Curated annotation (Swiss-Prot):
Domain of life: Bacteria
Originating gene: gmk
Extent of the signal sequence: none
Described purpose of this protein according to its UniProt entry: Essential for recycling GMP and indirectly, cGMP.
Alphabetically ordered keywords of this record: ATP-binding, Cytoplasm, Kinase, Nucleotide-binding, Transferase
Location(s), subcellular: Cytoplasm
Catalytic activity: GMP + ATP = GDP + ADP
Organism listed in the record: Chlamydia caviae (strain ATCC VR-813 / DSM 19441 / 03DC25 / GPIC) (Chlamydophila caviae)
Record lineage: Bacteria, Pseudomonadati, Chlamydiota, Chlamydiia, Chlamydiales
Identification of the protein by name: Guanylate kinase
Guanylate kinase-like domain location: 18-196
Entry EC number(s): 2.7.4.8
Record-linked InterPro entries: GK/Ca_channel_bsu, Guanylate_kin-like_dom, Guanylate_kinase, Guanylate_kinase_CS, P-loop_NTPase
């Protein structure tokens, strides 16, 4: 078995101050799988933020692990209380990132990793320092194949997501890093190298 390597972390060095990473991608591009792999290899260095959402969980999803699944009423109450650093309405459902959750991850000495949509990532970037990463499928045909294989959307929903992916793809040039996920392991190694490089980036 290959030994797990921990990313060096020294809170006393300015380059190692906890950071916020955002990972965005069209549905089906593989961002969730890649982030899960990262969390498994580096549990002491990185922690995924949990977005709040009003959408229904998929069969394999668990509240408190994948998202915080809440009612629209609760989401709007939190929105009125200014609990969100960013929020969006996407495909008729609300998604939001809590500033408190990011702060708690930072206090634990870990980097925060937010897996959020393109609009949310760019919104965060405009408010606080953020390392932005975009994951792309190699083609629209491959993206459609993955969505069909996932089987969590009706045909009309899948087509809506595919159309939206064109908008997301067009915004990829606003991200610092772009990974084309045509091979999962290769893409993971690229993602890991980005995190390690950012861990050692000097603050000038």
């Amino acid at each position: 078995m290959k030994d797990k390597v921990r990313v060096p972390f020294s809170p006393d060095h300015p380059s190692c101050a906890p950071k916020l990473f955002t990972i965005s991608a069209p549905a089906g591009a593989g961002k969730t799988t890649l982030v899960r792999m990262l969390a498994q290899e580096f549990p002491d260095s990185f922690q995924k933020t949990l977005s709040l959402t009003t959408r229904a969980p998929r069969p394999e999803e668990v509240s408190g692990i994948d998202y915080w699944f809440v009612s629209q009423e609760e989401f709007k109450q939190r929105l009125d209380s200014n609990n969100f650093l960013e929020w969006v309405l996407l495909f008729g459902e609300y998604y939001g990132t809590s500033r408190l959750e990011i702060d708690e991850i930072w206090k634990s000495g870990k980097h925060a990793v937010a897996v959020i949509d393109v609009e949310g990532a760019l919104s965060l970037k405009s408010k606080i320092p953020t390392v932005t990463i975009f994951i792309s499928a190699p083609s629209q045909e491959e993206l459609e194949r993955r969505l069909k294989y996932r089987g969590s959307e009706q045909d009309s929903q899948r087509q809506e997501r595919l159309q939206h992916s064109l908008i997301e793809q067009a915004a990829s040039n606003q991200f610092e890093y772009v990974i084309i996920n045509d091979d999962l392991q290769k893409s993971y190694e690229i993602l890991k190298s980005i995190f390690i490089a950012e861990e050692h980036r000097n603050v000038l």
